[in-house]
Curated annotation (Swiss-Prot):
Disulfide bonds: none annotated. The modification N6-(pyridoxal phosphate)lysine is found at residue 46. This is Alanine racemase. The active site is at 46 (proton acceptor), 278 (proton acceptor). Catalyzes the interconversion of L-alanine and D-alanine. May also act on other amino acids. It comes from Frankia casuarinae (strain DSM 45818 / CECT 9043 / HFP020203 / CcI3). One of its GO terms (molecular function) is alanine racemase activity. It is an enzyme of class 5 (isomerase).
Length: 384
């Protein structure tokens, strides 16, 4: 099955494609569920399933054993409901004035980090005549969303009052790690301790949440003391390790699901001293063959991959030669026998010797999350 995303031209499968192995998603989620032990597993499918396609990957994740789905934005959660998913869905990032009523009507769980979110959820619940399912979020050390230690008691008290009124039900208490991908970092145990304190404060306020959740991919894999009632793996749903300090995917039974492939658009012989691409950041040192590859930064290939990242072409890894352009980049293939139409593998699981998303991340000084999630709308996803 090939999915044409908004902005992708029909019929360009031969040119470029992100092949998504849904069995790899199922296999990886099954491994995560096993790691979670008695805790339930929420598959995080935000950002269009980290670039892999939210709907097909959500379905595969549930087949692999997940029982919850998680999104950042309300429209993502509503799209899951529109696609027929009935499992619990948590959406956690909204601004004042967003359509909480639509979310409540669709049985989407909401997150509240501040009083305004509780008030808007309660107001929407009164309008719809339905009880809002809410997860209170504590900032235990990430310094991002979540109520601070000083504000947490008041948030719990407000939640308890609205629960007593019958307009909300506090389903969960949750937080998020700052350094879970560095399991020896002292903040990890510190955040677990502060999360336990936050749960105690919620209990003293009269709340009895059924799910307490803290663990992301890294904590799901290596910090069982952080599992509580529910774990929330994200990048590892798609077979990727959350960081080099955690270990390679295979160490945990994970398999990378995305392979980004295209085909050379042109090959040509050029003399020594030929400047290549914008600003001539690469110059040939001898007579050689150049290959033009029809993917660029508009497709999610970072411009910083200029003269840095490698691809597999003609049976060998080759470094990008010169500036990555909006729609294309160039390879210097020397005297090797290649032709227009030959396959170019940018990254994948590594089975054929191609670079992995981890290789690209290391070369570019970023994380594998960014490499896969930025693959653009012009690149069709083909599901296998």
């Amino acid at each position: 099955m090939t999915e044409q995303r908004a902005g992708s031209p029909a019929g360009n499968d031969l040119r470029s494609c992100a092949v998504i192995d849904l069995d790899a998603v199922r296999t990886s989620v099954t491994a995560l569920v096993a790691r979670a032990g008695d805790a339930a597993t929420m598959a995080v499918v935000k950002a269009d399933g980290y670039g892999h396609g939210m709907i097909p990957c959500a379905r595969a994740a549930l087949e692999g054993g997940a029982t919850w789905l998680g999104t950042a934005f309300l429209e993502e959660a509503l799209a899951l409901r529109a696609a027929g998913f009935t499992v619990p869905v948590l959406s956690w990032l909204a601004a004042p004035g967003e359509s909480f009523a639509a979310a409540i009507a669709a049985d989407v769980d909401l997150s509240a980090s501040a009083g305004w979110a509780l008030e808007e959820a309660a107001a929407a619940a009164r309008r719809t005549g339905r009880t809002a399912r809410v997860h209170l979020k504590a900032d235990t050390g990430l310094g991002r969303a979540g109520a601070t230690e000083a504000d947490w008691p008041a948030l719990c008290d407000a939640g308890a009052a609205l629960e007593a009124e019958g307009v909300i039900e506090v389903i969960g208490v949750w937080s998020h790690f700052a350094f879970a991908d560095a399991p020896g970092h002292p903040t990890v145990q510190g955040q677990i301790g502060r999360f336990r304190d936050a749960i105690d404060i919620a209990t003293k306020a009269g709340l009895h949440p059924s799910v307490r959740h803290l663990a992301n991919s890294a904590a799901t894999l290596v910090s069982p003391e952080a599992h509580f009632d529910l774990v929330r793996p994200g990048v590892s749903v798609y077979g990727l390790s959350p960081g080099p300090e955690i270990g390679p995917p295979a160490a945990f039974g994970l398999r990378p699901a995305m392979t980004l492939t295209t085909h050379a658009a042109l090959t040509k012989r050029v003399p020594a001293g030929t400047g290549v691409s914008y600003a001539h950041r690469y110059t040939t040192t001898r007579e050689t063959t150049l290959a033009v590859v029809p993917l660029g930064y508009a497709d999610g290939i970072p411009r910083s991959a200029t003269n840095t990242a490698e691809v597999l072409f003609g049976g060998r890894r080759r470094r990008i030669a010169g500036t990555v352009c909006m729609d294309q980049f160039v390879l210097d293939v020397g005297d090797d026998q290649v032709a227009a139409g030959d396959e170019v593998l940018l990254f994948g699981p590594g089975d054929r010797g191609e670079p992995t998303a981890d290789d690209w991340a290391a070369a570019l000084g970023t994380i594998n999350y960014e490499i896969v999630s930025r693959v653009g709308a012009r690149v069709p996803r083909r599901y296998v």
